[in-house]
């Protein structure tokens, strides 16, 4: 590629599972999993907040499930690695508060007619608009800046838990700046411009050791060599000290990492968070089906890059609008792609839940609550399954 090519920089960030906001997302989704495992018809809107030595779970839950909320909170904290006050939270000795009420009967009758409606008649749990996005720049059909930031965060946790870097503590953040070329609307990554990692650590390790270990055990296994060059900038724990972390360092809240959960700043976002919400909440199920639609468009070769928007009214099953934009990369006009999308996908919330098997609990939603909801290679991420789209290439 000629040196004179016009390029731009784009940055995405991520946080790993020990970040206080992500801790809250995981607790909220662990509660959702527990409810759905016993009662697939559970209606869950579970929020979590945390600060030093305290976790509070609150919201509206209507379920036949017998759920020990405190036990779920402590187990989730323990699994992440919050096992003593000096790492940011002590799972076994912190205070756990639970304030859970039933779903409002007004909402219940409007959305699912107190369970009397057939799946295709179930209305959206609220108004709102959701987006799905896909780009052919990575095998996952996701933005490279987001994929790399997310994988660095996941790798930080991996080398902490397997003992490769015993000085690591649970909290940490990553950020990746990629230099891109705009090829007629498609995004072509050229190189990684900057890598930033800020990770919590214990008292024993030096900044030089941190930098060396992060380069060797985190960055090298994650970022393909072809994207790194002698000009790539590394900021590794640039503040110089990050011993106090987790809820001890910052308060945490469910739903505060919605860009990390989705596309790293690419595409668009309707503003609704995912974690702690059952599939009647279109903030979640609508965003999942929109991702499947966008990914299927790109996978079919209909476009190199695509965004899909859908919108809903509370209590109404059919979406109010569906929008497709291929940024000028479409092989056929966007309005024809939109027609194919409407014929292929059922955007009614009750049918999304069935077609994507969203009423299954276990650890299904907990897995989504750290390291992104999209671009993951896992059978539980059913919305990542590409649906075949029927179309004919225009004659040359």
Curated annotation (Swiss-Prot):
Residues annotated to bind Mg(2+): 13
Chain sites annotated for binding L-methionine: 60, 103, 250, 281
UniProt-annotated location(s): Cytoplasm
Binding residues for ATP: 19, 171-173, 239-242, 250, 256-257, 273, 277, 281
GO MF entries: ATP binding; metal ion binding; methionine adenosyltransferase activity
Keyword Cytoplasm: yes
Record SUPFAM superfamilies: S-adenosylmethionine synthetase
Reactions mediated catalytically: L-methionine + ATP + H2O = S-adenosyl-L-methionine + phosphate + diphosphate
Keyword field: ATP-binding, Cobalt, Cytoplasm, Magnesium, Metal-binding, Nucleotide-binding, One-carbon metabolism, Potassium, Transferase
Record-linked CDD domains: S-AdoMet_synt (cd18079)
Free-text remark on how the cofactor is bound: Binds 2 divalent ions per subunit. The metal ions interact primarily with the substrate. Can utilize magnesium, manganese or cobalt (in vitro). Binds 1 potassium ion per subunit. The potassium ion interacts primarily with the substrate.
GO process annotations (BP): one-carbon metabolic process; S-adenosylmethionine biosynthetic process
Binding site for K(+): 47
Induction of synthesis: By salt stress, in stems and leaves (at protein level). Follow a circadian regulation with higher levels in the light.
One annotated Gene Ontology cellular component of this protein: cytoplasm
EC number: 2.5.1.6
InterPro entries: ADOMET_SYNTHASE_CS (IPR022631), S-AdoMet_synt_C (IPR022630), S-AdoMet_synt_central (IPR022629), S-AdoMet_synt_N (IPR022628), S-AdoMet_synthetase (IPR002133), S-AdoMet_synthetase_sfam (IPR022636)
Pfam family, one: S-AdoMet_synt_N
Tissue occurrence: Expressed in roots, stems and leaves (at protein level).
Cofactor: Mn(2+); Mg(2+); Co(2+); K(+)
NCBIfam families linked to this entry: metK
Family: Belongs to the AdoMet synthase family.
Subunit structure: Homotetramer.
PANTHER family (UniProt xref): S-ADENOSYLMETHIONINE SYNTHETASE (PTHR11964)
Stated name of the protein: S-adenosylmethionine synthase 2
Organism the protein comes from: Atriplex nummularia (Old man saltbush)
